[in-house]
UniProtKB/Swiss-Prot annotation:
5-phospho-alpha-D-ribose 1-diphosphate binds at residues 81, 84-85, 89, 91-94, 109-117, 121. Homodimer. Pfam families: Glycos_trans_3N, Glycos_transf_3. The gene is trpD. Anthranilate 1 binds at residues 81, 112. Transmembrane segments: none annotated. Its cofactor is Mg(2+). This is Anthranilate phosphoribosyltransferase. The lineage of its organism: Bacteria, Pseudomonadati, Pseudomonadota, Alphaproteobacteria, Hyphomicrobiales.
Length: 337
């Protein structure tokens, strides 16, 4: 079938799609056979009715089948959020990724430019001088030599060109916010995944379990698709097929609570300058929340036995300059491609 309309009608009637039907629908979208109106109608019908685990797994299958793959070392991790939380914070996962890389865990980071916010990972890294327009071999070199490689979503998911304009015009969250973190081109099995709403914490952990992930935390922190320092973070931790639920507070990281205003960022240039300032030694709320997310990532990757050890390793990555060196090497290696 190459017609999306029957699937639009089914979802609009509040019927759930099977994994096979969901995969077929998203293959139609990614092949370019659907019109922008059909895509927009389908995405919004899914959102209003609510996406199911089977629909997400099927959609991810369609994305993964078409993506451009990257080789990464065993034990690599991704630190990624769905976006779409509307909070306008700094690029927290980006700084956390540099801290983790500086602590010696390879990071295969997947991200994009801002679609429904002011600054995505790609916007900040581009402003810092990282070359985003590089191929899989060069990204693998970045991971090997800098400890961090950035996989620009539009480079690795070229089929998304059929969806991008519609997503921008809609200007709101869709299932594609959920799919991005699930379709890492390096096939990482360890991730810290932030989701834009608390109701997605458990379902995405289930999806990742079904997709074969090994060690993952899916988190939501009081409106943020990150571990937050503003209050309570909900966590679904997947380890070897078992999902455990718990909550975290800033005190679990040895941190004080802050207001959301303390975490507000700006555009790519603004956030890049703030990130560089932390690498240069600034101590502020942006640093602290990034340390918390890095600490959790180090625990997920098995480098730290608990969050406090993760915080110690993360702080050393900053204080020793290792995180800053990771960025400098990423800039150098990416521009030598």
């Amino acid at each position: 079938m190459s017609d999306l309309k029957p699937f639009v009608a089914k979802v609009a009637a509040r019927e759930a799609l099977s994994r096979d039907d969901a995969r077929a629908a998203f293959e139609i979208i990614m092949s370019g056979a659907a019109t922008p109106s059909q895509i927009g109608g389908f995405l919004m019908a899914l959102r209003v009715r609510g996406e199911t685990v089977d629909e997400i797994v099927g959609a991810v299958g369609a994305m993964r089948a078409r993506m451009l793959h990257v080789k990464a070392p065993d034990g690599s991790i991704d630190i990624v959020g769905t976006g779409g939380d509307g909070a306008g914070t700094y690029n927290i996962s980006t700084l956390a990724a540099l801290i983790v890389a500086g602590a010696g865990v390879p990071v295969a980071k997947h991200g994009n430019r801002a679609l429904s916010s002011k600054s995505g990972t790609a916007d900040a890294l581009s402003c810092l001088g990282v070359n985003l327009e590089i191929g899989p071999e060069a990204i693998s070199r970045c991971i090997g030599e800098a400890g961090l490689g950035f996989m620009f979503a539009q480079q690795h998911h070229s089929a998304m060109r059929h969806v991008g304009p519609t997503r921008v015009e809609l200007g709101t969250r869709t299932i594609f916010n959920l799919l991005g973190p699930l379709a890492n081109p390096a096939g990482v099995r360890q991730q810290l995944v932030g989701v834009y709403a608390p109701q997605w914490v458990d379902p995405l952990a289930e999806v990742l379990r079904d997709l074969g992930s090994e060690s993952v935390w899916v988190v939501h922190g009081e409106g943020l698709d990150e571990i937050t320092t503003t209050g309570v973070t909900k966590v679904a931790a997947l380890k070897d097929g078992t999902i455990t639920n718990f909550e975290l507070t800033p005190a679990d990281f040895g941190l004080e609570r802050v207001t959301l205003d303390a975490l507000k960022g700006g555009d790519g240039a603004h956030n890049a300058a703030a990130l560089q300032a932390v690498l240069d030694g600034a101590e502020n709320a942006y640093r602290d929340i990034s340390l918390a997310n890095a600490a959790a990532s180090l625990m997920i990757a098995g480098r730290a036995k608990d969050l406090m050890e993760g915080m110690d390793l993360a702080r050393k990555s900053l204080s020793s300059g290792a995180a800053k060196v990771a960025l400098q090497r990423l800039i150098t290696v990416s521009n030598a491609a």
